[in-house]
């Protein structure tokens, strides 16, 4: 699971981990990518073999509203010959989310490895990790966030200007604490977790969770944990483990792709003439391509 609030840098981090660190993410279930493919082609091709008709049966078991399930019931969304087809009026974020949930369940049922990219603001994502763990999977979480939803909102604004999807600032702000809380709640269901802070110009890998050793980091003793990490650190200390140490240094092999990921994003923004929003000296600032700095006042609360 690659997770974190909207605009934290999940997609860029995931790409760099795969390219530079050779992380195998297997079949990546990303609702945004599924939505884009369905909008473009009217269909989505799962990377697994599935029985015709099983999607409709699955939809009926979910808690989605009837108006969403009706698209599966009336044949507007069908699974035939390993292709999920959507009628034009059936394409929306809710139907796509249900399909992503279905594919997740099928992977767990078939015991085939997969990954998800998620804002992690809904408890169902914690439930998915619990279910996978209970079915014999090793579960990994890569979680990235920033010190302020203001930074995230500004980066989503840049993403939108570059052709990506938008998210309202108030939704980013409301989801932010939920994402962090769910990361804390997920710890007992994880084999391992890696935590990244993307507040400044350089994304930083600063802590690791291991089911045997607990929270491993050199940053706590140095006062270096980002503020957003406090609920996760508190939860980690309450979970009994066999070891536990704070003398390890951040893994250079993970630190390098994280740094490159953030630098890539900044380079894309500057190339398009956009400002970037980062933490500098404890302040949130907007930096122009020419290096001009402007402090950002206020918050999204």
Predicted segments with their positions:
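Walker A/P-loop
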Residues: 11
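Conserved substrate/cofactor phosphate-moiety recognition/catalytic segment
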Residues: 18-109
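Amphipathic, hydrophobic secondary-structure cores in small proteins
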Residues: 254-293
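NTP-dependent small-molecule kinase module
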Residues: 187-240
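The feature captures the helix immediately C-terminal to the Walker
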Residues: 14-15
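A glycine- and Lys/Arg-enriched "phosphate-lid" helix/loop adjacent to the NTP-binding pocket
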Residues: 134-182
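The conserved Walker
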Residues: 5-6
């Amino acid at each position: 699971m690659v997770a974190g609030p909207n605009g934290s840098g999940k997609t860029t981090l995931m790409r760099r981990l795969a390219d530079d660190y050779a992380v195998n993410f297997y079949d990546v279930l990303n609702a945004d990518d599924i939505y884009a493919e369905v909008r473009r082609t009217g269909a989505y091709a799962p990377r697994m073999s599935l029985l015709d008709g099983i999607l409709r049966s699955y939809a009926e078991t979910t808690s989605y509203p009837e108006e969403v399930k009706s698209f599966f019931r009336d044949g507007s969304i069908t699974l035939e010959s390993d292709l999920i087809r959507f009628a034009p009026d059936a394409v929306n974020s809710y139907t796509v989310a249900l399909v992503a949930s279905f594919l997740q369940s099928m992977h767990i049922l078939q015991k085939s490895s997969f990954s998800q990219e998620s804002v992690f603001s809904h408890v169902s994502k914690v439930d998915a990790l619990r279910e996978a763990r209970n079915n014999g999977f090793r579960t990994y979480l890569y979680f990235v966030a920033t010190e302020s939803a203001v930074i995230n909102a500004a980066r989503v604004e840049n993403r939108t200007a570059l052709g990506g999807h938008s998210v309202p600032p108030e939704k980013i702000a409301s989801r932010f604490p939920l994402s962090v809380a769910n990361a804390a709640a997920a710890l007992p269901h994880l084999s391992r977790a890696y935590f990244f802070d993307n507040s400044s110009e350089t994304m930083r890998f600063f802590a690791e969770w291991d089911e045997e050793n607990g929270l491993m980091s050199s940053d706590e003793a140095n006062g270096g944990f980002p503020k957003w990490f406090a609920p996760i650190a508190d939860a980690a200390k309450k979970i009994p483990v066999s070891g536990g140490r704070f003398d390890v240094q951040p893994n250079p092999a993970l630190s390098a792709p994280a740094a490159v990921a953030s630098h890539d994003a900044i380079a894309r923004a500057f190339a398009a003439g956009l400002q970037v929003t980062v933490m500098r000296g404890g302040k949130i600032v907007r930096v122009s391509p020419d290096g001009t700095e402007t402090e950002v006042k206020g918050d999204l609360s």
